[in-house]
Every structure is written in structure tokens, then in C-alpha cells.
């Protein structure tokens, strides 16, 4: 199929809307606080960098509006339920991985059993759509944060897809906690933000998405609560390797870790922003040195599977219905920190991490106490307590997750073997691809998307129909291309970078 230039592409207008900022100087403090007062600003999918090359081809790539079913899902995510979940998890005293697993009211075993019972309660009301399992293994001493053998258990709820059930998307939070001493498994460690907040989102999404009044998703969605994160990402590593060993087709994984507060240690509030960390070049065990060199040669280091997944989230989950801005961070994680998305990346799966915009380290990995602030000398409350959580904010982060997961699960999977022809010196670009792993049953057509090489998100698109090759009059030297499938229901999937 050959597509020549034709049709006028409307000029991309840079949206001028910006957050209204209210600056206030509290009388009792000399610290300026910046508060975002505009709850929503429209998504930016164009930028000055995207103005060249100028082409009269295709159309503007716009954000994807939520479907009727997705709007229903978003409307039912409850801050009160999220708060109740977090307070219940805190009530177990500590959820340290090494803590007791036999006490019915204290320790990680009690938390595990309660999480399982909640998932099972939702499963019982789902008419068989949701199934629940506790999976795990016995971890031996590691010479670091596991001094004696301990059982690592993950609680997993699976919403089986209908249409392409072998394609899987997974969302997780970790239910273990810690205080100042990573090996203190007896002391109180409430872990409200880190990471009861993430577990609360997994539970709430399972509740809402599995209800009888909704259609089944096309692909399978897994909701997980994992253990062992604070001791070395053990639960997530076990889960990722279990899926890899069974050759599972996981096309996207999100972990929600520290999503509980929108307020920084200096009082700065950004209640309508969430960070999404997305890795660049994959690990060498996923892409070998030769593949890595090819990626670098074509300028594809910013178009890894994880970053394509993040672009999809930006395009589908940043809107007035979620009331959130998704700030994509082109980095694996924060400095000196790690998260449960990493084992999935190392297993070869696209994965990314949601985290609040500004962290207060007095409320993470701390013994509960009142102590001096090293900056101000004033007494402050230390500890990861529920009183420092913003439950409305957590529910909005949950909506971002829901929008991304539902759109992913209702759209076709990623095209495979996506190639760009470089056999001749030409000023056009020829592409070939194979259908998604699940075949063409859900596919209504394919789209070529592109952006300027220094633009962060897709700015243009062209529908090329139900084909597996296409040539367009736009030089591959000047832009970054992607190929994505469009569903018969109109839902667009994740784009894939073409390799020579």
C-alpha cells in the first residue's frame, strides 16, 4: 500500500492553558508554598519541537476519550474505601516481611490473609469473572536483609479477558512495610503511604472492574499485592519470573508505590500530578549488545517498550475524567530507590512505576516519633502514618491506573516484527509488520504515528487500514515512527518502534 501526500494537516496549536498558581506566605513560617489551584489542564500532545518537519500528511494525534464503560469505572473509585483499606492495613502493627505469619491480628501473615479475603469477597460478587490465589516460595537467607528463612507470599486476583485472554496487564502494590531499621520485624511499621496506598489501589480496581454490570475486558487484568519489596523486591521478582517461566504475554505492568500524598516536606502541594517512571534502554539480558547498538544507531533509546507504555498512559489517562496530569519521567526510578516494576523489566516485560510528585522522607522508612527537623530545628512528627495520606489524591491516582488498564485491555495488542525498510536511499518510509500475538480478531486497522525526534509524545497519526505494510511520503531520517493497532471498537493500542 502506498500513501502519497494529500489532505491538509491542521496546524498544531500549542495549548496555552497552564496551571494557575497561588503563592502564599504563611504567617507562621518563612517558607513559600506553591499550590496548584487549577484541578485540570488539557493534555499537551504538541510542542514547539514538533513543528518541524512541516508535512501535509495524516492528522493530529489527540488523546483518547474514555468509553462509557470506563467513565462508569472511574466514577465508582471511592476515596472512602481506599481510606478504609489503608487504615485496616496499618492496624496490623507491622507488615515487615520477617514478622509473624501465624498471628491473626498482628504482622504480615494477618495482612496477607485479610487482603486475600477482600479479593475473595470481590470475586464472590463477580459471577465467576475474578479468581484469587496466594502464590509464593521460601526465601533463604541472603546475607543482607533476609537473616533467616521466610515465606514470601503474593496475593493475586485475575480478571480473565474475553477475546484475547492470553494477553495480560498487571497492576501491583506491595503490602510489606518497614521502619528506620530494615531488619526490625517486631517494631511498629504502619506503612500507610509505603505502600498500603498502592495495595489499596489494586484492591479498589479489582472491586470496580470485576462487577457484573461491566463487559469483560478483551485482555486479562491481574491485580496483585506482593511482599518482600523492602527486603529486596522478592515478591515481585518471584511473580515476574513465574510469568516468564510460563511464557506469559504480559504487555504492560504498573506498580503503585508511594502514591499516598501530594504534599512535599516544604509544604508544596501538587494534588493533581502523579509521576510515572519509565526506563530507557532495556537490560542486557533482555536486549543483547547487538540489539542495543541497533537501537542507539537509529535513535530508539527513547522508544523502548516501557516508554511506549508511558506514552500510552499519558494519552489515555490524563484528562478531565481522571483530573490528573501524568508527568512521565524518563528514568527507571528515583535516585537511591527501587520498585517492583524492575523485576518485570528484567524479565522482558514493559513496566513503569507510579509515584507521588513530591516526597516527604520524614514519612517514609521512619520510626514513629517526634524529633527535630534537621533543616528548621523544629519538632516534627516522623512515621508513615495515615494522617499524612491524601485519600482523594490516591483515588485520582487509582483513576489514572484504571483508565490506562481498561484502555489497554480493551484495545488490540502490540503489532509484532515491526520493520522499516532501509535497503535503498529514499525520502519516503516503508513499513511492514505482523498482527499482535492474539491475531487480527480484535483489529479494525493499523495506524502509523510519528513525532519530531526531540518531541516527547506522538503528535501525528495516519490510519492505513487493515494492511500489514505501508509506505508514506515522509523521511524516516527526520522523525520517530511507531506502528499501532486500532480495535474494531475504535480503541487504539500501544505503538511499537520499527527497526531496520
Swiss-Prot record:
It is found in: Secreted. GO terms for cellular component: extracellular region. Residues 1-24 form the signal peptide. The keyword Zinc applies. It is an enzyme of class 3 (hydrolase). Its cofactor is Zn(2+). CDD domains: FN3, M28_like. Its main location: secreted. One of its GO terms (biological process) is proteolysis. Belongs to the peptidase M28 family. M28B subfamily. This is Probable zinc metalloprotease MGYG_02393. It comes from Arthroderma gypseum (strain ATCC MYA-4604 / CBS 118893) (Microsporum gypseum).
Amino acid at each position: 500500500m502506498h500513501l502519497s501526500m494529500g489532505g491538509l494537516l491542521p496546524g498544531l496549536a500549542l495549548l496555552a492553558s497552564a496551571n494557575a498558581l497561588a503563592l502564599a506566605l504563611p504567617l507562621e513560617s518563612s517558607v513559600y508554598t506553591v499550590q496548584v489551584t487549577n484541578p485540570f489542564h488539557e493534555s499537551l500532545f504538541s510542542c514547539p519541537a514538533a513543528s518541524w518537519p512541516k508535512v501535509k500528511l495524516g492528522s493530529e494525534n489527540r488523546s483518547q476519550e474514555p468509553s462509557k464503560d470506563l467513565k462508569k469505572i472511574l466514577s465508582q473509585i471511592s476515596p472512602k474505601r481506599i481510606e478504609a483499606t489503608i487504615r485496616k492495613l496499618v492496624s496490623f502493627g507491622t507488615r515487615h516481611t520477617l514478622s509473624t505469619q501465624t498471628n491473626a491480628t498482628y504482622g504480615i501473615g494477618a495482612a496477607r490473609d485479610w487482603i486475600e479475603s477482600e479479593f475473595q469477597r470481590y470475586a464472590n460478587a463477580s459471577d465467576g469473572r475474578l479468581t484469587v490465589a496466594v502464590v509464593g516460595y521460601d526465601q533463604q537467607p541472603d546475607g543482607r536483609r533476609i537473616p533467616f528463612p521466610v515465606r514470601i507470599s503474593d496475593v493475586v486476583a485475575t480478571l480473565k479477558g474475553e477475546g484475547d485472554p492470553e494477553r495480560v496487564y498487571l497492576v501491583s502494590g506491595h503490602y510489606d512495610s518497614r521502619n528506620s531499621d530494615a531488619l526490625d520485624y517486631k517494631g511498629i511499621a504502619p506503612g500507610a503511604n509505603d505502600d498500603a496506598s498502592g495495595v489499596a489501589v489494586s484492591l479498589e480496581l479489582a472491586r470496580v472492574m470485576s462487577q457484573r454490570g461491566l463487559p469483560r475486558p478483551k485482555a486479562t487484568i491481574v491485580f496483585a499485592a506482593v511482599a518482600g519489596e523492602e527486603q529486596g523486591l522478592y515478591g515481585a521478582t518471584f511473580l515476574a519470573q513465574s510469568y516468564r517461566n510460563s511464557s506469559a504475554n504480559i504487555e504492560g505492568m504498573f506498580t503503585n508505590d508511594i502514591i499516598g500524598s501530594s504534599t512535599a516536606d516544604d509544604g508544596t502541594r501538587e494534588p493533581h500530578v502523579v509521576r510515572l517512571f519509565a526506563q530507557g534502554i532495556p537490560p542486557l539480558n533482555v536486549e543483547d549488545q547487538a540489539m542495543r547498538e541497533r537501537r542507539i544507531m537509529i535513535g530508539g533509546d527513547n522508544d523502548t517498550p516501557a516508554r511506549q507504555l508511558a506514552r500510552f498512559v499519558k494519552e489515555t489517562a490524563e484528562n478531565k475524567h481522571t483530573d490528573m496530569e501524568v508527568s512521565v519521567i524518563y528514568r527507571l526510578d528515583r535516585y537511591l530507590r527501587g520498585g517492583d516494576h524492575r523485576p518485570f523489566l528484567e524479565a522482558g516485560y514493559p513496566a513503569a512505576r507510579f509515584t507521588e510528585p513530591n516526597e516527604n522522607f520524614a514519612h517514609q522508612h521512619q520510626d514513629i516519633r517526634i524529633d527535630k527537623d534537621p533543616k528548621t530545628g523544629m519538632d516534627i512528627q516522623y512515621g508513615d502514618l495515615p494522617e499524612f495520606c491524601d485519600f482523594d489524591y490516591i483515588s485520582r491516582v487509582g483513576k489514572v491506573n484504571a483508565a490506562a488498564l481498561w484502555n489497554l485491555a480493551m484495545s488490540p495488542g502490540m503489532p509484532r516484527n515491526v520493520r522499516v525498510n532501509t535497503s535503498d536511499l529514499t525520502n519516503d518510509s516503508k513499513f511492514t509488520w505482523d498482527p499482535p500475538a492474539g491475531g487480527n480478531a480484535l483489529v479494525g486497522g493499523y495506524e502509523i504515528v510519528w513525532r519530531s525526534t526531540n518531541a516527547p509524545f506522538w503528535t501525528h497519526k495516519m490510519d492505513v487500514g487493515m494492511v500489514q505494510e505501508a509506505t508514506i511520503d515522509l523521511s524516516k531520517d527526520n522523525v520517530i515512527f511507531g506502528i499501532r493497532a486500532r480495535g474494531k471498537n475504535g480503541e487504539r493500542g500501544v505503538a511499537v518502534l520499527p527497526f531496520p
